[in-house]
Amino acid sequence: MDAVRRLLIPVAAVLALVLLPTSAGASPASVSAAAVQGTRPLDRTVWLCRPGLVHNPCGQDAEGMPQSAGPELVTHYPSGGTRLLDATRFTAGASGRREPFTVTGKPPVDCFYAYPTVDLLPNPPLQTGGRPPVPRDVHHAVTLMQSARFAGLCRMFVPVYRQVPLPALLAGIVVGSGADLTTATMDIRDAWDDYWTHDNRDPETGERRGVVILGHSQGTAVAAALMRERVDEHPGVRRQLVVAALLGGNIEVPEGRDAGGGADPASTFQHIPACRRPGGAPMPTGCVVSYATYSLPRGSLPAVIGRTASPGHRVVCVNPAALLRGEAAGARVPLDLYLPTRRLIGGSALLPNGPLAVPLNGYQLPDLPTGFARHPDALTGECTHATDGTASADWLQVGGDLSHFPASAPAGLTGLHAMDFNVAQGDLVALAAAQTRAWLDRRRP
């Protein structure tokens, strides 16, 4: 619970400036606590995206191929409207060029994604018993923004879960009660069990499929809890893990080691290591990529995310661009930035950031006809470590053209938290593809 509070405090503090006021009858924290106490497991998983759904928002059929005619993947908002995942690519001295997003072969592995905190109110409003949450546009918008471009590699599994909403996170911090993720963790764990039981076996071969686990912010917290229970201590399940990209949260390891080793309660995982590739070693699989994104002045440390006061431990920072290139862990390398556009997330003239108006407060997204604006060399990133006598911190230090972000964001309390996936989205997808190839090669006789 302390780790969860360290993760969520700065996010809640910033959101306090933009959240709607709550009623005077009961604080969101007390409402949330009461709701958690009265909940039970869902009768069935609520899927935002699952291959083969009749109207799959992620646009995939049962095999992961586009449901629509043609190779471009067409996604669907729950309230209506379609979006492509294409990008306008910008390079120095050249005008933008459209890059379509196509799927031409059956995805060889699966992706299981836990989205970050986006609910402003409890979903469902009355969280008692097994009342199910409802898929909403905000869940789809953040899925498109963060994880949908993995669909060329993965069949996408995205459960809707009863997360702690933003006002309740804030109120929990204010009154000192913390965030109770019991129900959120239960829903994600049960969705995983549903997936593992009914969907993980390949329909053609009958063999278990490889899995990429994705999470961000609260999604990272619940995905990490799921992995501790269902993956870390189970060698047979660990063998199916291609990689876990758990961003915007603290994944902790002992100093000088990449996992806990079996008996270190302060480590997030005992057996699943951080992804490392020393000295041109083969591409690692079955490991974790994690970072929090900032652009801090020299001598500064992140406020909370990326920071730990646990003696003898550090927060994991793995730069996906450096790992992909086989560079040293602390190397400064270009990042492949994919900014979501107003069109992608359903923005309008009245509400430019659409259903993500609160999480993306202050961001001015590109107004383009494509889903993303790609700037492959606008940013650089390097994993950075520092201490201040009371804590140590590890984070992805971003440099280059920061004009794409609000001026106060890069060095603020949460840094570029809202864009953790996007600052290196091209690298994350390319890395997962390379790790998938390595994982498949190692399984061949």
Tell me the role of every PLM-derived stretch.
Residues 5-9, 13-148:
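Flexible, membrane-associating and regulatory peripheral segments of lipid-active enzymes
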Residues 112, 212-215, 243-247:
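Extended hydrophobic secondary-structure segments that form protein cores and membrane-embedded regions
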Residues 117-118, 217, 250:
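Residue-level signal for short, function-critical loop segments
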Residues 165-168, 221, 251-255:
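Short, well-ordered, mixed-charge alpha-helical segments that flank or form enzyme active sites
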Residues 182-207, 228-411, 415-419, 425, ...:
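Surface cap/lid and interfacial helix-loop subdomains adjacent to catalytic sites
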Residues 214-219, 223:
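Gly/Ala-rich beta-loop-alpha elbow adjacent to hydrolase catalytic centers
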